[in-house]
């Protein structure tokens, strides 16, 4: 898997913003990526040192449109904790 395919986008919620002061960032990642790949990709792209990576798999929700039943996509979320003194400047403008 290529480096640019692992990390999809940041999760921009009120709860995820509370962790930014402590060096904790939340990103949506590819479902096939493991913790080692996520850590390596994050350190190479953003040039920071990662302390830990926690991941969660989510199943898509069932959605209905009249009598038709569909489902949203499954996704994986990674909570990335940076080492002390490290910050991520890409989200500081928000």
Curated annotation (Swiss-Prot):
**Family (UniProt):** Belongs to the universal ribosomal protein uL23 family.
Say if the entry is tagged with keyword DNA-binding.
no
Specify the species.
Answer: Mesoplasma florum (strain ATCC 33453 / NBRC 100688 / NCTC 11704 / L1) (Acholeplasma florum)
Q: Which NCBIfam families match?
A: PRK05738.1-3 (NF004359), PRK05738.2-4 (NF004363), PRK05738.3-2 (NF004366)
A Pfam family annotated for this chain is: Ribosomal_L23
Q: How does it assemble?
A: Part of the 50S ribosomal subunit. Contacts protein L29, and trigger factor when it is bound to the ribosome.
One GO biological process term is: translation
A GO MF annotation of the entry reads: structural constituent of ribosome
Q: What does this protein do?
A: One of the early assembly proteins it binds 23S rRNA. One of the proteins that surrounds the polypeptide exit tunnel on the outside of the ribosome. Forms the main docking site for trigger factor binding to the ribosome.
Q: Which UniProt keywords apply?
A: Ribonucleoprotein, Ribosomal protein, RNA-binding, rRNA-binding
**GO CC terms:** ribonucleoprotein complex; ribosome
Protein's name in the database: Large ribosomal subunit protein uL23
State the InterPro entries in the record.
Answer: Nucleotide-bd_a/b_plait_sf, Ribosomal_uL23-like, Ribosomal_uL23/eL15/eS24_sf, Ribosomal_uL23_CS
């Amino acid at each position: 898997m290529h480096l640019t395919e692992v990390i999809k986008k940041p999760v921009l919620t009120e709860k995820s913003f509370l962790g930014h002061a402590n060096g904790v960032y939340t990103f949506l990642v590819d479902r096939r990526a493991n913790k080692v790949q996520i850590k390596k990709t994050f350190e190479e792209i953003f040039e920071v040192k990662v302390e830990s990576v926690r991941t969660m798999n989510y199943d898509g929700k069932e959605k209905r449109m009249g009598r038709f039943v569909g489902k949203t996509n499954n996704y994986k979320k990674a909570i990335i904790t940076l080492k002390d003194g490290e910050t991520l400047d890409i989200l500081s403008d928000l």
